Design a protein with these regions (language model features):
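Signature of dsDNA virion morphogenesis modules
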Residues: 1-191
Length: 194
């Protein structure tokens, strides 16, 4: 089966992640955890924080896909692409863009924390995760009662990114074509000057 590396096309303004979707079955096969505040004061439990934490992208994780021609293949993102995607997500002010199952736009959802796992002592381990180096981890504040209820019922379990990426192989073909066209232009120009 074909394996395709997806990259960010830096010449394309639309390339990158537009939103984070909360989904029942995340393609990266990593569920988030719901963080709650459990401080007990005078025998009272404080209100829930309503924060979800989990992986947004895991580098080199093969993700199964099937296109409209019924062709099956896997995609993956390199560590470099994961880092670029996480940076562009915030540079383009997309931290308040969220959807449910990639269909319904959601209000009251914000990515409030984000980092790239850099080693074996990453803080995500404090929450029971064991992500590989280069994983983009996010924490999302949920001020949406409907979604928070879905979290508590186990109807949404993880994050899934939404965005536009280029196929590295197809991009290399485009670059080869551009090089060939430039060589042809150069030959034509040289012939015209002679």
């Amino acid at each position: 089966m074909r394996i395709v590396e997806l990259i960010i096309d830096e010449k394309d303004e639309t390339s990158g992640i537009d939103a984070v979707s909360v989904v029942e079955s995340p393609a990266i096969e990593s569920d988030f955890i719901a963080l709650k505040k459990h401080e007990i004061e005078l025998k009272e439990v404080d209100a829930e924080k309503r924060i979800l934490m989990g992986a947004a992208l895991i580098p080199n994780k093969q993700i199964y896909r099937k296109n409209d021609k019924n062709e099956e293949y896997y995609i993956y993102f390199s560590e470099e692409t994961v880092r670029k995607a996480s940076e562009l997500f915030f540079m383009n002010s997309n931290q308040n863009n969220a959807t449910l199952e990639h269909k319904q736009k959601l209000d009251g959802m914000s990515v409030v924390e984000s980092w790239i796992v850099e080693g074996s002592h990453d803080k995500s381990m404090n929450y029971g995760f064991n992500f590989p180096k280069g994983t983009w981890v996010i924490s999302m504040k949920v001020n949406n009662d409907e979604i928070w209820n879905k979290v508590k019922l186990g109807e949404v379990k993880g994050f899934s990114i939404e965005g536009y990426f280029a196929d590295k192989y197809e991009m290399s073909l485009v670059n080869e074509d551009e090089i060939l066209i430039d060589k042809i232009k150069q030959i034509i120009t040289e012939n015209e000057n002679n």
